[in-house]
Amino acid sequence: MARNKTNNDKNIANDEASTVLARVLPSNVQAEQMLLGAILTNNELLNYVSEFLRSEHFFEPIHQKIYNGIEVITEKGLIATPITLRSMLANDELFHEMEGAEYLAKLVTMSMMVINPIDYGKIIYDLAIKRYLINIGEEVVNDAYNSSLEFEAKEQIERAESKLYDLASEGINEKSFTKIAIPISESIASINRAMKNNDHVIGISTGLIDLDSKLFGFHNSDLVILAGRPAMGKTAFALNLALNACNNMLIKNKRDNEEVQSVGFFSLEMSSEQLTTRLLSMSAGIDSTTLRTGMINEANYNRLRKEAIALSELSFFIDDTPALTISAIRTRARRMKRKHNLGILFVDYLQLIRGVSKSDNRVNEVSEITQGLKAIAKELNIPVIALSQLSRAVELREDKRPMLSDLRESGSIEQDADIVMFIYREEYYLSRKEPAASDPKHAEKYAEWQDNMSKAHNITDIIIAKHRSGPVGNVQLFYDSQYSKFVNLETKYPVHPR
């Protein structure tokens, strides 16, 4: 009985699929003919539709060739007429099959009935989008039936969602020229906000005063690269920045009566539990080893619970899915922007992201990833902070302070980033250079080493190596490794370690 029902369901599904495939794709050949004829009669009309209409939007192949020919001719500063088009398409096989010269004359004749050519352009565009939508639907169905595909169902859904979003955005959200008065008004508003703020931070505050004085906060549409060698504290620093940003956005949103903005954190390496343990450690002031082992007294536990409740109420979202593609990250970020008003995005880390296109060249793949991250920042109008590894070349030289050339697969990373920051802890490298006891000058060298260690103790350098809209330079922070916490170094600031 159950088997018969299953077979019936399959038969119904197959019949429905056959019906869908048998349908004629939506098109309006007459609208295409009338628009092309109107443009051939008056080339100025091309300016009104070329902003959203492309040759591939036409259904008939001959119309695609004619529209493309008109664009090529007019771009050269010439006039597109049946005569100039006939000369251009003289060797085209399809043009000859359609008796092109007579067909062009027919189009011009039909244009006499055109009242508003822009309306015809919109009809052609709308029908093309519907055909693309049908193609996406067929791809989704075929992929779902194909069990040999390497993609899991969830990833197929994300791929479909990404294609649908791209289709929805096509031609509609494309930017064109904007009268200068609009961006000037936005700039003045931004300057006014900065004047009202005592700290003159016009972006999302990092919560670290000296760093804010260099960056002026994190800015919408910026791609920020935070790079460092292993054990420098990249993830810990990113978590500090994310938590500070979350708290500072909440304060601003409440003050200005705005919708609460969220922090998104993609963790491709560590689990969400590992990240939240670190967040609890830095918030409660209890080292993470104590938290993991459970060796905690009642007073600390009560403080921990209080901080856990406070953190739980924040609009802070973690996605710890490993090996995400840049396309999946874009899809999930879009979804979060829509559902939770995403205000800033962190990605840990860049080298663990997979490109969409299959490429044996890692440099090209990283270029695709960094361009994708920058596109997310611009599209969603948020800062994107991406962590990055540095090459081993750092370890091979005496001076371990990072440089732009140390970025792994560095060309595109440096080019696409608005800000490149390096995190560097001299103490880490000094601790591995303790003078050997067998050295004849051990006492002298040991005293010098101890002095250097004392100066570098708990100090982290944030090296701003590239800043598209501001100064570069070095900022020193106090790093409490016990609690994975970064705070202002100077005692003159409200939050400091002394």
Curated annotation (Swiss-Prot):
Residues 197-493 form the SF4 helicase domain. Keywords: ATP-binding, DNA replication, DNA-binding, Helicase, Hydrolase, Isomerase, Nucleotide-binding, Primosome. GO terms for biological process: DNA replication, synthesis of primer. InterPro entries: DNA_heli_DnaB-like_N_sf (IPR036185), DNA_helicase_DnaB (IPR007692), DNA_helicase_DnaB-like_C (IPR007694), DNA_helicase_DnaB-like_N (IPR007693), DNA_helicase_N/primase_C (IPR016136), P-loop_NTPase (IPR027417). GO terms for cellular component: cytosol; primosome complex. One of its GO terms (molecular function) is DNA binding. Pfam families: DnaB (PF00772), DnaB_C (PF03796). Its EC number is 5.6.2.3. The keyword Calcium does not apply. The keyword Heme does not apply. SUPFAM superfamilies: N-terminal domain of DnaB helicase (SSF48024), P-loop containing nucleoside triphosphate hydrolases (SSF52540). Disulfide bonds: none annotated. It catalyses: Couples ATP hydrolysis with the unwinding of duplex DNA at the replication fork by translocating in the 5'-3' direction. This creates two antiparallel DNA single strands (ssDNA). The leading ssDNA polymer is the template for DNA polymerase III holoenzyme which synthesizes a continuous strand; ATP + H2O = ADP + phosphate + H(+). ATP binds at G228, R229, P230, A231, M232, G233, K234, T235. Homohexamer. Belongs to the helicase family. DnaB subfamily. The main replicative DNA helicase, it participates in initiation and elongation during chromosome replication. Travels ahead of the DNA replisome, separating dsDNA into templates for DNA synthesis. A processive ATP-dependent 5'-3' DNA helicase it has DNA-dependent ATPase activity. This is Replicative DNA helicase DnaB. The lineage of its organism: Bacteria, Pseudomonadati, Pseudomonadota, Alphaproteobacteria, Rickettsiales. The gene is dnaB.
